[in-house]
From Swiss-Prot:
Belongs to the globin family. Pfam families: Globin. The modification N6-acetyllysine is found at residue 17. The modification Phosphotyrosine is found at residue 25. The modification Phosphoserine is found at residues 4, 36, 50, 103, 125, 132, 139. The modification N6-succinyllysine is found at residues 8, 12, 17, 41. One of its GO terms (biological process) is hydrogen peroxide catabolic process. This is Hemoglobin subunit alpha. GO terms for cellular component: blood microparticle; haptoglobin-hemoglobin complex; hemoglobin complex. It comes from the Eukaryota.
Length: 142
């Protein structure tokens, strides 16, 4: 999925508003994912999956850091996320549908915290951004 210039502007603007909350928002989105889609828990058998746990917070920071890198390199998502794609495809073997589920929960979390900023246009751009990230992360599954 190709991000337009307007999409890139929207993604950078909303991610700028996320700011220092990125890790917390990503952790909240992970907790939402695990609660709403219990099958996603199978990849984390060693985690305390209760909302707010140190492990959820830690993994949320990893997700947020990866997304922040993606936002900073919107014109080179494949290069930016290549190592992460290798990890998820070859070592972790995460079912690709889980990226879509997490993306949905990330949008819900953004809406909960930044409702005034998540206009329909920004929402559409973030959907495209998360879909682009998911496409890159699953590109090495083939």
């Amino acid at each position: 999925m190709v991000l337009s210039d307007a999409d890139k502007t929207h993604v950078k603007a909303i991610w700028g508003k996320v700011g220092g909350h990125a890790g917390a928002y990503a952790a909240e989105a992970l907790a939402r994912t695990f609660l709403s889609f219990p099958t996603t828990k199978t990849y984390f058998p060693h985690f305390d999956l209760s909302p707010g746990s140190a492990q959820i917070q830690g993994h949320g920071k990893k997700v947020a850091d990866a997304l922040s890198q993606a936002v900073a390199h919107l014109d080179d998502l494949p290069g930016t996320l290549s190592k992460l794609s290798d990890l998820h495809a070859h070592k972790l073997r995460v079912d690709p549908v889980n990226f879509k589920l997490l993306s949905h929960c990330l949008i819900v979390t953004l809406a909960a915290h930044l409702s005034k900023d998540l206009t329909p246009e920004v929402h559409a751009s973030m959907d495209k951004f998360f879909a682009s990230v998911a496409t890159v992360l699953t590109s090495k599954y083939r």
